[in-house]
Amino acid sequence: MVIPNTQKSWIGKAHLIGQTLTASYIRPGPVGDGFIYDPPTYEHPDTSGYDESAWMLLDGTPASCTNIGLYYNRRKKPVDLVISGPNYGRNSTALYIISSGTVGAAMEGALSGVKAISLSYAFENRSIPPPHVKEATTRSVELIKYLWENWDEQTQLYTINVPMIASVASAEPVFTHILENTWGSVFHEVGGSKTPADDGKRQFRWGPDFDAADRTVAESSGNNDGRVIEQGCISVTPLRANYKDIPTIQGEITLD
């Protein structure tokens, strides 16, 4: 298990070039009824009683965690499957998938020649009852086992979105395609204030219009990932690890 040591949302498949990554280690605690567990962190694996249950924390991106995990933190045999997640928040439709660190980490595995799965929990309310999380996890394990045993030879990675609903334990998995949606600016200009910190300079604060993304799903049709989740099903999208080209556009380009 290799994970970032801080929040790394919206970072895609980036690596922080020029940065030397530093590892620390934790031992995960027992599964309880809550979400928060703050274990002690160790700088060296030997002081944490390092074994199969120890987790490596890296001050890098999700994709970097995958790469380090594949080549420097593996056990006695090569890794045969990368599982990235679960992420608390949906990674469906083009708007979210392209920016997703969770999907980016799975993509890194696929680009290393390893089968990969990205797992995300899609919720409408952040107050998720712990039993729903447990049921979603159980359902996800069942689905991942199925995909592993029935892997499509053309697929390099799957991205899964599980709706965090009361009936998640029986939610049906459905193969989907990505909804190709767009939106406007993801920033708001900070106006009307001048402080010594900004010295009157123009500033822009992160503030995507998530409602606009939701509208693209509501207005869409067909078996896309966004609609399937809204219908209470689990979206399973098989992917190749590339930016898809347009095969019908070919030939020499003549410039006047």
Predicted regions and their residues:
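Redox-cofactor binding/interface segments in oxidoreductases and associated redox assembly factors
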Residues: 84
